[in-house]
Amino acid sequence: TAVFLMGRLAYLMVAKADYYNRAATGLHERERSIKAPRGRIYDRNGNILADNKAVCSVSVIHSQIEDEEAVIQVLNEYLDKGEAEIRKKVTKVSSRELIATNVAKETGDQIRELNVAGIKVDEDYKRYYPYGSLASKVLGFTGADNQGIVGLEVWYNEILAGEDGSIHTVTDAKGIELPNVKETRVSPVPGDDLVLSLDLTIQKYATQAALSVMEEKQAKRVAMIIMNPQNGEIYAMVDVPEYDLNQPFQLNTDLAGYESVTDGEKMDALNNMWRNFTVSDTYEPGSTFKIVTATAALEAGTVSLSDTFYCPGYKIVEDRRIRCHKTTGHGKV
């Protein structure tokens, strides 16, 4: 028995030393995340199209609460969550309970200054779009976790996101942070910036022009792309109606019977609003493709530059009559 116990002890001290060391550390250390600022998105001239706004997240640590009613009263006064919801979270026995995110920095600072035991206020970042709906279908937006959902925000998420940091604090057996023990901090790594070929001024003018056409023609939507033909750079990409990037879950059109529609129908309406039709749909090229067919005909020797044609306003192909946009025809061309 003694030999067995010695062998078991040696096994635990040598083979399982790292495991039990980590387990012991986990019992008296608490880790808090430090959010990394997301990379900015710029236009070609250095104008910021997507930025970060400092906000706060508010949590409670149950083991540190000295007066539950005081905690509930403070949070109810400063946060728009409702007393019943706040009370439910404050009285819940957990190591750390998140109460609210995206709290205005001024509000977070006010709560922190009250120094109520059990309430923790951490710095966070919220995505902010200074031009509202401008280029919304191109830029896309982020979710509550600051991760990209649609558009360039999700396409370049790994570049923009950065790496979160952390704060490690030492606690006693009850989970209360020890006041005189230095905390260990791992700094966050900010995300990389993204510079687009878009030109803010051209994008604004293109958006105004598209909105004017939509109103004049009573169209459901109007799309426009302005491109440099020499290198393919896109200076403007518009798909109106756009939506407010700072309130992406607010529909930009009326949905009949919105209160009675299903969640699935609401989600379909939102997805349709977020969709960039300039790149997600296919369209008949129309007259822009005439240069291709004309060049092919000249190259094949089917026609020459001196040939003329008569346009009666339609063309018979097999059993179909394909009409010209000018139904009376262009005559001799």
Per-segment meaning from a language model:
Residues 252-280:
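Surface-exposed acidic, glycine/proline-enriched linker/cap segments
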